[in-house]
């Protein structure tokens, strides 16, 4: 399955929530009408969505939010099952540990897609080494930095300013002068993704 390249607002409306696919500088506002499904006037249905439908919808929402394809997502779920603790929480923590997501959380990209592009174009280092794999899992204590060639990009500095004004997550520490940050710890489940119901995804893969 290829990555979706169409209108981001359409995806948000399909899932009924903001997927944070667009920069806060161009945030999806009221016009997106998340509660209205794609189509000129939205699709209507007199039938209640099945449990399977709800589970599938939640999985699709999380995949699109983090920009992960089905095969990758299944691998993350398998790893989450192998780890101790709650499988659903483990799954989300794995997704949060992806390098592209950490770059986004640190404010070096205004969206996960922009952060992913920065990584793939070799604009990011981890502990001083260039890493261009978006799915690379960042560990506690790792230092993630913007390379010199990428520091000149106005979008990087603008994104960081915006992120700082909105408040950076507690699990990262960012030096705005050096354009680098430390992944202080894995976030607690209650620190992010309050609109995600990971138990539905666990139920889906347990069928």
From Swiss-Prot:
InterPro entries: Ribosomal_uS4, Ribosomal_uS4_bac-type, Ribosomal_uS4_CS, Ribosomal_uS4_N, S4_RNA-bd, S4_RNA-bd_sf. The keyword rRNA-binding applies. GO terms for molecular function: rRNA binding; structural constituent of ribosome. The lineage of its organism: Bacteria, Pseudomonadati, Pseudomonadota, Betaproteobacteria, Burkholderiales. PANTHER family: 30S 40S RIBOSOMAL PROTEIN, SMALL RIBOSOMAL SUBUNIT PROTEIN US4M. Residues 31-54 are annotated as: Disordered. One of its GO terms (cellular component) is small ribosomal subunit. Residues 97-158 form the S4 RNA-binding domain. Pfam families: Ribosomal_S4, S4. Keywords: Ribonucleoprotein, Ribosomal protein, RNA-binding, rRNA-binding. Gene3D superfamilies: Ribosomal Protein S4 Delta 41, Chain A, domain 1, RNA-binding S4 domain. Residues 42-52 have a biased composition (Polar residues). CDD domains: S4. This is Small ribosomal subunit protein uS4. Part of the 30S ribosomal subunit. Contacts protein S5. The interaction surface between S4 and S5 is involved in control of translational fidelity. The gene is rpsD. Belongs to the universal ribosomal protein uS4 family. The keyword Translocase does not apply. One of the primary rRNA binding proteins, it binds directly to 16S rRNA where it nucleates assembly of the body of the 30S subunit. GO terms for biological process: ribosomal small subunit biogenesis; translation.
